[in-house]
Every structure is written in structure tokens, then in C-alpha cells.
Curated annotation (Swiss-Prot):
Biased composition (Basic and acidic residues): 81-91
SUPFAM superfamilies given in the database record: P-loop containing nucleoside triphosphate hydrolases
EC number: 3.6.4.13
Domain writeup: The Q motif is unique to and characteristic of the DEAD box family of RNA helicases and controls ATP binding and hydrolysis.
Intervals of motif Q motif: 182-209
Protein's recorded name: ATP-dependent RNA helicase DBP3
UniProt organism field: Chaetomium globosum (strain ATCC 6205 / CBS 148.51 / DSM 1962 / NBRC 6347 / NRRL 1970) (Soil fungus)
Binding site for ATP: A225, E226, T227, G228, S229, G230, K231, T232
Residues covered by region (Disordered): 1-139
Annotated Basic residues bias: 39-58, 92-102
Uppermost EC category: hydrolase
Gene symbol of the encoding locus: DBP3
Length: 566
């Protein structure tokens, strides 16, 4: 081979090798495992960083939502004290506002009230804007109390004049400005009011006018008014309206327990029976049942009555009998959404305090029930205990003994005072001539056209009442009696005979002094001075009722000094 050819061949080989080397280098760059591994690491690192950033962002978002929920629910747990970025704070506030709006909308929806743009609308032509109610959904009832247009249209000066004339003082810790219901037409339209249950009455009594707006709004109410002022209807109307607008809870078939949705507790059998009669007439108009439970009557008969009605919507009871049925398990108050203590000062007196705690403790918690207390007096000694059963109660006080709002206190406190329409007289007599003087007073009071006037004679002890009754019978006085030693049927007959006018004189111990509706009592005579000033006020409060005048005479002897404060 010539040198030229060899040189050319070497050049071709070198060129081929360079091309091959270049191709090999390209191939190594694309397929070399080490290079691929390096690229993957870089990519993984980048992906990991992005995931971490997303996770941190999500965590911050969740923290912000949790903080917003804590603010919304009032949670007392500690939250991050470090300042948040402005954007995050704004985001939290927006979420809170949205949640508030949703909650309000849900509440309106659950109440059954039609809404327009989230604002409750009343379909009645006579309805005005919704008024404050404080706790409308607390016990599960669909409260939608609204002042009527006719009530709204009354000038404020006339409202103030009405309150002053009727001596009404209202103290509301929540400051809801609800006007008194001056006329029955001012009551919201409902199934009950459409039946015209008040057709025979001219206007609500002051305690009804003052308490109804708040009670119909779902608020707890303390009503303080003299006896004979219409307190029974003051709590009966909102109780029945509340139950009529709420669904009945379901219970297992075959459950023999009697469940109630409302309970009214009264201190005496007579008052319980009287309240039962008044509430039954209203409840029947809307298909609700009322059962009365009291001592002195067979338990089996009352159990049978409960079974017959599959329980009762409303139970009116004395504390002792209700406590017995609760302990036996035949009555349950776990569904009670409306509780009433009638004659509350006596109910919370020393002997009833534990019973009341047991009864109210068997009901729904106070946050989930409505509690009303009505009474003629409100002694300082029981105010604190009574308010422990309630939430932000409104105090409606009737009479010139009120001091609600005085000097900016707004505490609704009252001074104990007898009915100012009652003429009071005290006669100091010799103990041995007391019953003879009683006979003289009765004959003087029942002269001529007043011979059938009703006179109520109070004794301190049962034995004294029996002796006085027998003595008057021997002297030809038409008399009957009511005291603790009599059977329930005997007490009922005596009370009905006195109300009907068959007998014109009723001899009683203090058991008859509280809350009984005995119309047209012209005179009250205290043969023996009562043990407390509260009992004295309630005794003489049997006369001078419903705006009428009355008279009370107390026979006072040296033996009465020890318990009269003399």
C-alpha cells in the first residue's frame, strides 16, 4: 500500500472515530443512569418543596377557620396570641359573618316563620315589625311574638299614662321595650285567640297586660300583684300558646310513664283545683289536656286519669303529690318546656324549698325551659333563691309598693304592703271575750240587706277553727269550715257552698288564705293574729279583690304579742 493511500485511510478512520465518539457522547448524555438520577433528585426536591408549601398554606387556613369557630362559639380555650397577617384576619371575619348569617337564617327557618331576604314576616295584616324577645328559641317553642299595628299606633304618652294609672313597674335586665297589652285585640292572632276566650271580659288586668308580651316572647317572668288580680290567666295564656305551637315529643310504644310538657305547682289543693279548672277551659280550645294531681285523693284514680290521657300536656299539682309520682316513676317532667310556680313566695318558703328544687330539677334545664313565677308578695329572703331558677327574668310589679327602676336601680324590688282598698281595723280584746265579740261583729255585718254578705273568719289552729265553727252553729249562724283535718271532699263541699252563698260564713285556717278565688268577700275577721306579716297580707287579701273595696277586722289579745312583732 502506498503512503498516500495509507494516509487517506487513516484520515477516514479518524473521521469515523470522531463521528462515533460524538454519537456515543450524545447517547451517554441521554441514557446515562447517573445523569438521570441527578435530574430526578432535583425534580423530587422541587416537588417536595411545593407539597410542603401547600401543606403549610392548608394548615394556616385550618387554623384560621378554627380560630373563627372559637370566636363564634365563645370557646374559652386559648388561641394563638401572635399577631396574624392582615389578610388572614380579614378572611376570619368574613367567615364569621357568613356563619352568623347562616345561623340566623336557620333559626328563622326552624321557627316556621316565613322569611323574605332573611327577615321574618308575619302573614297577619295586623302584624308589625318583630320585637326583641330575649330567648325565643330557648325551650324549643317557635316564638314569634310581634306587637300589633294597633298597639304600635298608640302614642307613647298614652302608654306612659296607662302604666302610671295602673301602677305598673317593669324591670327588664335585657332592656326589651315591649308595650303592655292594653286590650285583648292587641294579642297576636293565633288558634287560641281566634276562639275568642275573653269575650266576657272588658280588658286584661294590669298583671296580664304587663307580663303577656314578655311571656309570649319566651322570656322568664316574675309577676308580683295582689290577690284577685288575674295571675292565673297571666301564666295560662302564654303556657297554652307555647304548647300549641310546639310538636309533641315521641316516646316508645308501651311506655306507661306519663310525660308532661308543662307543669304548674300550687301550694294548696284548693288552689291547684281552681287553677286546673281555669286552664282546662282554655286548653280544650286548642286540643290540649290538663290533669290535676293533689293529696287527699286516691292515687289510683289519678294514675288512671294519666293513663287515660296517655300522660298530659299540662300537669297542675301540689308539691307533695307530684313528688310522690316522680319518685314512683309514673310521671316524668323530662319534656317540660314551661314551668310555673304559683304563689311563689310560699312555694319557696322553708317547707317547700327542697320540693321545688326536686321538681324543677326533674324538668329540662333552665336554659331549655321557660319559668314563670306569680305571687302577691316577694320577700327579700326568697328573691335570690327564686332567681336562681330563672334566666334574666323580667319583673312586672303591680301596685304603689313598687320601686322598679327607682333611682336607676331597675331591680323590681317591692315593699310588702296590703291592698290599699281594704279598710283595716284592729280591736284589742280580752282573750275570754274574743268569741263573743266575733259573734257581735258577724251580726252587725249581716244586718238587713247585707244578711247574705260573705264573711271569711280566720283562725290560727285547726282545733280553734273547729271550736269556733261549732260555737257559731249553736248561735244559728250559717257556717262551714276549711282546714287541714277535713277530707278533700269535705273541703271542696265547704268551699263550693260558700261560693254559692248557701253558707255566708267560712271559718278557715291559713290553708285557705293563699290564692283562692272566692268572689265578693265583704269582710275578713282575724280571730287570732297570724304568725307572719306575709300571712296577714294574704288573709285580708281575700276581700277588696278585682278593684273593689273591702274591710278587715283583727281581734288582738295579749297572747298575740309574741308573734305580731309588738
Amino acid at each position: 500500500m502506498s503512503a498516500g493511500k495509507k494516509h487517506a485511510r487513516d484520515g477516514e478512520d479518524q473521521g469515523a472515530r470522531l463521528v462515533k465518539k460524538a454519537k456515543t457522547a450524545d447517547t451517554q448524555t441521554d441514557s446515562d443512569p447517573a445523569a438521570l438520577k441527578t435530574d430526578k433528585k432535583k425534580k423530587d426536591k422541587k416537588d417536595k418543596k411545593e407539597r410542603k408549601e401547600k401543606k403549610e398554606k392548608k394548615s394556616k387556613k385550618e387554623d384560621a377557620e378554627e380560630d373563627s369557630e372559637e370566636l363564634q362559639n365563645g370557646d374559652s380555650a386559648a388561641v394563638d396570641s401572635e399577631p396574624k397577617p392582615e389578610k388572614e384576619k380579614k378572611e376570619k371575619n368574613n367567615k364569621k359573618d357568613k356563619k352568623d348569617k347562616k345561623d340566623k337564617k336557620d333559626k328563622l327557618k326552624s321557627s316556621g316563620a316565613p322569611t323574605t331576604n332573611g327577615i321574618a314576616q308575619d302573614g297577619e295584616a295586623n302584624a308589625a315589625t318583630t320585637t326583641p324577645n330575649g330567648s325565643a328559641q330557648r325551650n324549643g317553642a317557635a316564638y314569634s311574638y310581634q306587637q300589633t299595628k294597633t298597639l304600635d299606633a298608640i302614642p307613647e304618652d298614652e302608654i306612659k299614662e296607662f302604666l302610671a294609672k295602673q301602677e305598673i313597674a317593669i324591670a327588664d335586665p335585657l332592656g326589651a321595650n315591649l308595650r303592655p297589652i292594653i286590650h285583648f285585640s292587641h294579642l297576636p292572632t293565633s288558634t287560641l285567640t281566634s276562639k275568642k276566650p275573653f269575650a266576657s271580659f272588658t280588658a286584661p288586668t294590669p298583671i296580664q297586660a304587663a307580663s303577656w308580651p314578655f311571656a309570649l316572647s319566651g322570656r322568664d317572668v316574675i309577676g308580683i300583684a295582689e290577690t284577685g288580680s288575674g295571675k292565673t290567666m297571666a301564666f295560662a295564656v302564654p303556657c297554652i300558646e307555647s304548647l300549641a305551637s310546639s310538636p309533641k315529643p315521641n316516646h316508645a310504644k308501651g311506655d306507661r310513664t306519663a310525660y308532661a310538657r308543662a307543669v304548674v305547682v300550687s301550694p294548696t289543693r284548693e288552689l291547684a283545683m281552681q287553677t286546673h279548672a281555669a286552664m282546662s277551659s282554655l286548653a280544650s280550645l286548642v286540643g290540649l289536656s290538663v290533669v290535676c294531681l293533689y293529696g287527699g285523693a286516691p292515687k289510683d284514680d289519678q294514675r288512671a286519669l294519666l293513663r287515660k290521657n296517655s300522660g298530659a300536656d299540662i300537669i297542675v299539682a301540689t308539691p307533695g303529690r307530684l313528688k310522690d309520682f316522680l319518685s314512683e316513676g309514673c310521671v316524668s317532667l323530662s319534656d317540660v318546656m314551661f314551668a310555673v310556680l304559683d304563689e311563689a313566695d310560699r312555694m319557696l318558703d322553708k317547707g317547700f324549698e327542697e320540693d321545688i328544687k326536686l321538681i324543677l330539677g326533674s324538668c329540662r334545664p333552665r336554659e331549655k325551659r321557660q319559668t314563670l313565677m306569680f305571687t302577691a308578695t316577694w320577700p327579700t329572703s326568697v328573691r335570690g333563691l327564686a332567681e336562681g331558677f330563672m334566666i334574666d327574668p323580667v319583673k312586672a310589679t303591680i301596685g304603689n309598693r313598687t320601686r322598679a327602676g327607682e333611682e336607676g336601680e331597675g331591680n323590681g324590688s317591692t315593699e310588702l304592703q296590703a291592698n290599699i282598698r281594704i279598710e283595716q281595723k284592729v280591736e284589742v280584746v280580752d282573750p275570754r271575750g274574743k268569741e263573743q265579740r266575733l259573734l257581735e261583729l258577724l251580726k252587725e255585718a249581716q244586718k238587713g240587706s247585707a244578711k247574705n254578705d260573705r264573711i271569711l273568719v280566720f283562725c290560727l289552729y285547726k282545733k280553734e277553727a273547729v271550736r269556733v265553727e261549732q260555737n257559731l252553729e249553736r248561735r244559728g249562724i250559717r257556717v262551714c269550715s276549711i282546714h287541714g283535718d277535713l277530707r278533700q271532699d269535705q273541703r271542696t263541699r265547704s268551699l263550693e257552698s260558700f261560693k254559692a252563698g248557701t253558707t255566708s260564713v267560712l271559718v278557715a285556717t291559713d290553708v285557705a288564705a293563699r290564692g283562692l278565688d272566692i268572689p265578693e268577700v265583704k269582710l275578713v275577721i282575724n280571730v287570732t293574729f297570724p304568725l307572719t306579716i306575709e300571712d296577714y297580707v294574704h288573709r285580708i287579701g281575700r276581700t277588696g279583690r278585682a278593684g273593689k273595696k273591702g274591710k278587715a277586722i283583727t281581734l288582738f289579745t295579749e297572747h298575740d304579742k309574741s308573734h305580731s312583732g309588738s
